């Protein structure tokens, strides 16, 4: 990738001279789509971010919104009289292209990068969530990528001691040439520990702490701003970073000590565009400049030139602004943790200047470098959405057995059992449920976390599908009794220069923004990843959302039946099958299901039901519809006898619904009165069997439409384990 003629003309006109090679490379990376959001930034104004405290609903929780390394959200407290506010940080990143070229290192360094974004704010990382998207599971290449990505996430996350507690995995043939790896991180801090990525004062020193700089990851930002080529695995390997989790662990602990000692004025991790990106963005945000001596950067490879030192994306490095009086102490702490350390320059008024030997290799206005890229004016065409119902007939038993044994509905235990999800002793609800639940004892609240998207939904109808993604994640945390308070997004799309691709991308942005606004959930930060396009075509528009909610306890009803209650289905239901797993398996098209007109009331009511003492189990209805929800709820000790109105009721994926096991059905009906329908499904049993009757088919037939048991279902849902073990 090189600078376009128009960009080059704009830059040389601004500077009044030709660019040095280092400047050209720096602008190429910082003005890339990956760094500058040239095709998406105007669209992001649709989101309610909480920055406008007077007008944004949900803003009372937002301390720092979009624009920093991570967002900062104030947690509500059980004891409101406490004087110490407790904050969490929220961040999400993509490492899509690197994970195709090198799935292990690509995914591992994705984890490392989002953790360092957390460190930049003065927070300690306490939880990870990973949302992964791959091509058709039956392909050998897909299984290779899945195996490598999961191993990379597990090895890195486990080694640094941060639990991976939530996430999602989706398979769709349009990810075959371009998988997605989206990783979110939650951090914890108090208000006095808060640091930002905004340079504070001229005269302060810039200090580099962490790994030595090598040549790995060169041009990573520009690499992430192009379609993947057929030869990407070999040609683009140098653009993929190599991680060292044990250095990252030492960096986490050193950062904690530096923040505790109040030695850090501002901070930024070295991610996209390396030292050049981190240092220029830090001073630009403060309206300042810097003078950096590149020869002072500690290096692990010989004869590195200025451009390589500036742009290498070697991992496990932090750039700190430090008062001159504190520089020696920072060096002592770095040495204590066996970390590299170098005073590379200082913050000044004026330009961003880098020297190498006796030569000035960069001398540009920091604000122009960081924020001067012009936005793209791209054409967009409205994506077609199905309007007719055309799909083959299929009997309920065949449909049920088909739908519970697909890669998308299969058990993901093979994946999350590789993650240490309990390190840190905060995990109150483990992976495999609707949402994770993390104990924030400092505030006396439980923090529920859900992350994911459903590409079949957004492919069927980008706008409504994105709305459904937001509602689905909100429903997940509500099903565990939590009230949503904030979210971050990772907006993944194909090549935006294709009008159809850009049109669908615009729709997912607007759909996600509209539903989050309706739910009063501020989207406090995020990431955009475009050019997820390859020789096999663009990916489906994929709006990953990581959403948190809070509750006053550290426990929640599980997504597993007890055998002691009545089963109810709560929420509005549409009989359309658009975007469903059933249609993905049997073929055909249908309209996307209608969404509830009162989603906030539905989510609030579900949270109240989940916290009611009569509630024994809760599980939201999502991919695979009610059929999969019921299959996931039964255990060897608890089954169910269920009756539904029609076959479509089993397979529609209308979001905003949940199955409740309760000993007091009237209490559930009272809570949902005037909000959404409450349908009696039947009773639970203690024999581990599931029988489903369908009213409109079985009136003259005494045998159930579906009969199965927990052992059979578990075997059918083992397809990932059977293929990969």
Swiss-Prot record:
Belongs to the FGAMS family. GO terms for cellular component: cytoplasm. ATP binds at residues 37, 489, 526. The keyword Magnesium applies. It comes from Haloquadratum walsbyi (strain DSM 16790 / HBSQ001). InterPro entries: PRibForGlyAmidine_synth_PurL (IPR010074), PurL_linker (IPR041609), PurM-like_C_dom (IPR010918), PurM-like_C_sf (IPR036676), PurM-like_N (IPR016188), PurM-like_N_sf (IPR036921). This is Phosphoribosylformylglycinamidine synthase subunit PurL. GO terms for molecular function: ATP binding; magnesium ion binding; phosphoribosylformylglycinamidine synthase activity. Mg(2+) 2 binds at residues 117, 269.
